[in-house]
Structures are given as structure tokens and as C-alpha cells.
């Protein structure tokens, strides 16, 4: 493989491993943190990206 092919393969692998984050909605800087309805802990941003309507953290969900 030549250098151009190596670079293309490296970029493709980086995109597959890291995921394509261009289409993930990001919270604005002024958005207040979302708190758990059960214990009041702040919900992690990665949880909110996967489940935008999440109300409970994984500690409270695990106790159910």
C-alpha cells in the first residue's frame, strides 16, 4: 500500500473506532445540568446523548 492508501485507511479506522460525532447533538454552554430525579446527581452527557429524556442515573435505575 502506498502512503495515500495508508492515510485513508488510518482515517477510516479512526472514524470507526471513535465514531462519527458530527451528528451527535451537543448541549449548549448555557444549558443547566440535568439532575437525577431520585438522588439529585448530575446525569452524564453521554447518557443524555443516548437517552435524551433520561430522568434517573444508573445508581437509581439499578436499585429498581
Curated annotation (Swiss-Prot):
| Subcellular location per the Swiss-Prot or TrEMBL entry | Host cytoplasm
Main localization (coarse): host cell
A single cellular component GO annotation? host cell cytoplasm
In terms of domain of life, where is this protein from?
A: Viruses
The entry's keywords: Host cytoplasm, Late protein
Protein induction:
Expressed in the late phase of the viral replicative cycle. Expression of late genes is activated by the viral late transcription activator C.
* Designated name of the protein: Uncharacterized protein gp24
Name the source organism.
Escherichia phage Mu
